[in-house]
Amino acid sequence: MKKSVRLLGCVLVLFCLLTGPVFAAAYRPFPDNRSISEVFDSIKVDGSYDRTRIRLITANDEAFYSRWKMVEDARETIDCTYCIIEKDIFGQSFIGLFVKKARQGVSIRLMIDGRVYRMPYMSKMPDKIEELAAFPNVQIKLYNSIRKSLVSVFTDYKKIVASNHDKIIICDGLVSIIGGRNIGADYFAQNGENDIVYNDSDVLMQGRHVAGQLKKAFDDEWKFNRNLVVKADAINFKDQLAKVELAYRVMTRYMQGGGLFDPEKVTDGKLKEALIEMNKEISAFKNISSYAAFQMFRGEREKPVKILDKHSHTGPLNGITPALIRMIEASRHEIIIQNPYLVITEAAEAALKRAADRGVSIIFHTNSAESTDSLFPQAFLMNDWKRLLQTMPTARIFVAPSQNERLHAKMFVFDGTIAVVGSYNMDPLSEDLNSEVVAAIHDKAFAQMTRLRILRLIEKKNIEYRIEVDERGKIIKTYGPEDHVNEKTVKKMNFMRKLQWLRPLI
């Protein structure tokens, strides 16, 4: 017995020695910063301000479970807006879930971005969504429909490309979720299960005041006069309702650990074909079969939370960019920015440079050309990264080296005190063109947890871009995109980064 205890003790000591430096490097206590607390206090929100039960979700399976469960549990109302609802098994089953809730009498408002809705890769999905629109308790709109926005082509072309980039679900005016994820396999699968797998982040919240703030953000975009109401087909040549309801049943059974339905028991030939295809698709996702044990909240406590909203280019409100810049200005110790696209605006860069001049540590975590889903932001980062490190000597830039580490999360941490999580990217597209929404959480424990998750992701397998300067500040050595990105892609980016007139649209 004593020998076993001694052996266990040696193992624990060895574990601490091996893991201790990593945890010690990642964890950093921060002194109170009154200035940054004052920034949070100065943010005005509609209605009464109170504390919110909140959970940070970074695991892809839990992100899907959260959305599914809150919609499944809804009894009265569902407000939902997404830029993309994919035509894969995740998107189809989600529409099938909405059909179920519509049959139960739940009032549903669904908004989808008008630019994505008619894309070729979304073929047949509009027909399925139009089936949902046939229910009298369901309203569906396309945000800033191209058909209606074309009137701006000669007056303000930016209004044509302005998108609703919010990702919001609000159920029964109580439970809500926002973040970076759309509805599709890319956001909920694990590495090796899908061609594209994102590292992303959401916040799941419970509280009527925050739900009310998000409803205000939703309503602002819902009322936009260039939205197009989606109506059911007057003549329905192909009934898509049975297919989305089948997708719902397939997903529910699989998530509960029940495996697949037997196609041989389906008598309808078209549905049998659809089931075979769905079984083949869902079988690839090995890590979404533990829904039965999932709990939305696991002892998370209430935190001070405020919603920051921003209209698209078609509206006047921008509550995000100025607040983030004020948080940068108020930081005294550390700023962490995790974002898939690092095309920093002049105002943000100036604020970050002033922070660096104060000695504030700045950590950027973003994509590289090898991991990104959009090459233009990486081309412009090629123009910027050396200057950023040269003018901000306290800054470090870490990039995801391959598609296995592809980043889509949008998180900020200021002095280990305030965390910001949502849909906002560090690029002109979010700053000027698209609607966005984020949650600002003023709580050291939550901010430290957010910080640690970012640093853990960086520690896994990321590349650091570096420069060395001489005594006069001249760059004499670098390690950057040209050192790890394939030559063909570098040539392409070298051409793209010359197109500076496109930068405001990236």
Regions found by a protein language model. Name each.
Residues 1-9:
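Bacterial N-terminal signal peptides that target proteins for export
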Residues 9-19:
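Bacterial N-terminal signal peptides
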Residues 23-55, 63, 104-175, 185, ...:
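PLD/PLD-like phosphodiesterase catalytic module centered on the HKD motif
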Residues 52-55, 251-319:
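Active-site cores of enzymes that catalyze phosphoryl transfer or operate on phosphate-rich substrates
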Residues 69, 93-97, 326, 347-354:
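A short acidic, amphipathic alpha-helical/loop segment
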Residues 70-75, 102, 325-333:
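Secondary-structure "cap/kink" motif recognition
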Residues 78:
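Phosphate/adenylate-binding glycine loop and adjacent helical scaffold
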Residues 207-209, 213-260:
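Non-catalytic, alpha-helical, charged scaffold/linker segments
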